[in-house]
């Protein structure tokens, strides 16, 4: 899967995309992450990407021109893509939506910033997604959340289909308690059923939890 990210702050993604599972998926050629700095597409001499809002209001609004030109350029290859904008008014991301997005061959994610995005630019996108009812500085962190939860659903990224199926929310259930070594620690013991070797009993215990 290819994921293009349109952002004013591409440097925010370097640590996330170059660590852990996402880095391994990138190196293995399973995922293809591409960062696009919206400022590079500004027609302004000073690379401006925002301006005051018509009708007043607090804060600046992202202008449509840099977004349109950036989008136009990265879609020149003709490959179809699902265009997503991170915005507080969008659908709240959950595991069902993540699975839906994981079925796409390519995603393009626009990170909102400032007071919002010019509605003419928003109209170019297929979907609007939020990660919750709270205020963030910009859309970069929501984009990271989308990238992470969608990527781990792509076959081969986790290395095992069972890893994906066992995780919290995969079947509408939260994950069961996990234990590691040692058997006893500070007077706290691992449940006996987990040490029994009886896989059927373990499975029932996990489901009950």
Positions of the model-derived regions?
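Short clusters of hydrophobic/aromatic residues that line enzyme substrate/ligand-binding pockets
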Residues: 49, 54, 93, 101, ...
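Short, solvent-exposed amphipathic alpha-helical segments in soluble enzyme
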Residues: 20-24, 99-103, 124-126
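Hydrophobic/aromatic beta-strand patches that form the interior of the parallel beta-sheet core
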Residues: 4-6, 34-36, 82-84, 107-108, ...
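Short glycine-enriched loops at secondary-structure junctions
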Residues: 38-41, 113-117
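Long, charged alpha-helical interface segments
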Residues: 169-209
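S-adenosyl-L-methionine/SAH cofactor-binding core of RNA-modifying enzymes
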Residues: 63-111, 118
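N-terminal nucleotide/polyanion-binding subdomain common to many enzyme families
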Residues: 1-74, 195, 200-207
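Structured adenosyl-cofactor binding patch, chiefly the S-adenosyl-L-methionine
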Residues: 117-169
């Amino acid at each position: 899967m290819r994921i293009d990210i349109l952002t004013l702050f591409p440097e925010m993604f370097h640590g996330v995309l170059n660590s852990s599972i996402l880095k391994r998926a990138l190196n293995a050629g399973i995922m293809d992450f591409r960062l696009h700095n919206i400022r590079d597409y500004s027609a302004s001499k000073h690379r401006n990407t925002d301006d005051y809002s018509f009708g007043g209001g607090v804060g600046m609004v992202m202008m449509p021109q840099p977004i349109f030109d950036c989008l136009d350029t990265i879609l020149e290859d003709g490959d179809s893509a699902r265009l997503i904008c991170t915005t507080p008014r969008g659908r709240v991301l959950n595991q069902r939506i993540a699975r839906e997005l994981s079925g796409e061959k390519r995603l393009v994610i626009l990170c909102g910033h400032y007071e919002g995005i010019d509605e003419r630019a928003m109209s170019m996108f297929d979907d609007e997604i939020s990660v919750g009812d709270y205020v963030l500085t910009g859309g970069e962190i929501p984009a990271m959340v989308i990238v992470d939860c969608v990527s781990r659903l792509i076959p081969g990224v986790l290395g095992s289909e069972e890893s994906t199926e066992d995780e919290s929310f995969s079947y509408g259930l939260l994950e069961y308690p996990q234990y590691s070594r040692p058997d006893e620690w500070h007077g706290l013991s691992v449940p006996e059923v987990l040490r029994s070797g009886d896989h059927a009993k373990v499975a029932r215990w996990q489901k009950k939890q």
